[in-house]
């Protein structure tokens, strides 16, 4: 399951992300953060952590450096 999720994120980064303008307010980007979270915490907890991060990625949040803890 973990590898499938990471594969989906990588496909998003390769095929969908280039069609959009860069908009992630964080470093590492939300997709890289998601990969790192899934690798570190597994499919379920990593996905939940990723969703929490993606919900913070909006114009009213200043963003910045936010590594997986």
Swiss-Prot record:
It holds the Pfam family YidD. It is a peripheral membrane protein. This is Putative membrane protein insertion efficiency factor. Keywords: Cell membrane, Membrane. HAMAP family: UPF0161_YidD. It comes from the Bacteria. InterPro entries: Membr_insert_effic_factor_YidD (IPR002696). Transmembrane segments: none annotated. The keyword Ligase does not apply.
